[in-house]
Structures are given as C-alpha cells and as structure tokens.
C-alpha cells in the first residue's frame, strides 16, 4: 500500500491530519523534522509527501529540493498558509503536484492525494525501467534504440557493422535486461522512460 508521509513541525496539525487520513483509509506516517524524514523514510516507493512549507532547520522547499536531487518517486503536495501561496506555486513549477491552504478540507485533500498517487505510481514504474536500462552496455543501448525505431536485424547489423547473429544475441540480452516479453512491450517501456507524463521533475535522469 502507498504511504502518505505527513511532514509538519506542529504535532497538533499532524495528529489531526493523520486521524483524518487514516479514517479515509490511507496508510500514514508522521514526521516533525525534514532531516529525519529524508534519513529514515523510503524515498523510492509509491507515496505522497504532505509537506508544510514553513518548518525550522529544513523547511518545505529544502525537503522538496532534496527529494528532487535524489530522484525520489514520492509525489509532493504542499500545505501552506495564505502568505505562502506564491512560494507554493513556484514549487509546483519545480515538480510539486499541488498545494492546499490550511485549514485543509476533506474533498480537496482527497482529490490532491489521488492525483499525487497517480503521479507517484507512474514515477515508480519509470524508475524501474530506468534501472533496467542502466544495466545495458553502450552497444546494447545503441541496438535497443534501433530496435525501438523499427529496424530489422539485418538493418541493425549494417548500421552497427556487426554480424546478424551478433545482433540476435544482443537483442535477446536487451529483451531480458529490459524485462520485455515482446517488441511491443520493449517499445512501450522506452516510451514510458521518455514520457514527461511519467516523470516527477528531478535532477535525476538516465
């Protein structure tokens, strides 16, 4: 089950919000310090960070920057006071899914969480594909690119100046490493890896 990470230095807020989220059926973890969250939470799973904009030591923007830099698949929804709206909008430009003004009501919260969970699940799938892709050798990556473009084995052999049998061997390895059972699935995986719709905006790229 995806986890909702609730990060706010005000324990009264986290307790009240956690009670609400749990009553809606979500798995919730509460954090009061950004550094503790970054050190202890699983950052590469499907989930959402409900993130307070203003916190001591490491504020919401700092936590969001850290998540972007490490390529986390967690989606971020900011909780803001009225005066923080411009900052929250700026963070959305940097990849946050949404922002909600305090006090938060149920329907907007649930809608934002569902959008964020969809984004996070797609990011997890994309990250798994990227990890598979990173196992390919440079030659296998070149071959995979040609396969995805629809080149036949003989055309690949000519383009790469290798034997057709060598193409067949490399192609089989590419399919195995990319965990693709068919050419169509391999192409879909490359499309997912490249699609901005499956990407949480980060500094981590293949």
From Swiss-Prot:
GO CC, alphabetical: cytosol; protein-DNA complex
Alphabetical list of NCBIfam families matching this protein: tetrathio_RR
Assigned keywords, A-Z: Activator, Cytoplasm, DNA-binding, Phosphoprotein, Transcription, Transcription regulation, Two-component regulatory system
UniProt DNA-binding region: 153-172
Cystine connections: none
Function: Member of the two-component regulatory system TtrR/TtrS, which is required for synthesis of tetrathionate reductase. Positively regulates transcription of the ttrBCA operon. During mice infection, the ability to use tetrathionate as an electron acceptor is a growth advantage for S.typhimurium over the competing microbiota in the lumen of the inflamed gut.
Organism, as annotated: Salmonella typhimurium (strain LT2 / SGSC1412 / ATCC 700720)
GO molecular function, one term: phosphorelay response regulator activity
Domain Response regulatory intervals: 3-117
GO BP terms, alphabetized: regulation of DNA-templated transcription
4-aspartylphosphate: modified positions: 52
Signal peptide residues on this chain, from the entry's feature table: none
Entry's localization field: Cytoplasm
Record protein name field: Tetrathionate response regulatory protein TtrR
Record carries keyword Flavoprotein: no
PTM comment: Phosphorylated by TtrS.
Residues in HTH luxR-type domain copies: 134-194
InterPro entries: CheY-like_superfamily, Sig_transdc_resp-reg_receiver, Tetrathionate_resp_reg, Tscrpt_reg_LuxR_C, WH-like_DNA-bd_sf
Record-linked Pfam families: GerE, Response_reg
Keyword set includes Phosphoprotein: yes
């Amino acid at each position: 089950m995806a986890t909702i990470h609730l990060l706010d230095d005000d324990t009264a807020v986290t307790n009240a919000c956690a009670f609400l989220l749990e009553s809606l059926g979500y798995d919730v973890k509460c954090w009061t310090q950004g550094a503790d969250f970054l050190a202890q939470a699983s950052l590469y799973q499907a989930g959402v960070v409900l993130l307070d904009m203003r916190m001591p030591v490491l504020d919401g923007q700092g936590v969001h920057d850290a998540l972007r830099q490490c390529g986390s698949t967690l989606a971020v929804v900011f909780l803001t006071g009225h005066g923080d709206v411009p900052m929250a909008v700026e963070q959305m430009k940097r990849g946050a899914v949404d922002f909600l003004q305090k006090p938060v009501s149920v329907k907007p919260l649930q809608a934002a969480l569902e959008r964020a969970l969809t984004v996070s699940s797609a990011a997890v799938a994309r990250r798994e594909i990227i990890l598979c892709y990173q196992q390919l050798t440079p030659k296998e990556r070149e071959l995979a690119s040609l396969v995805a473009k629809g080149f036949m084995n003989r055309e690949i052999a000519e383009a790469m100046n290798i034997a057709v049998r060598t193409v067949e061997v490399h192609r089989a390895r590419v399919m195995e490493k990319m965990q693709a059972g068919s050419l169509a699935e391999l192409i879909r995986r490359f499309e997912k890896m490249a699609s901005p719709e499956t990407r949480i905006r980060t500094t981590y790229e293949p």
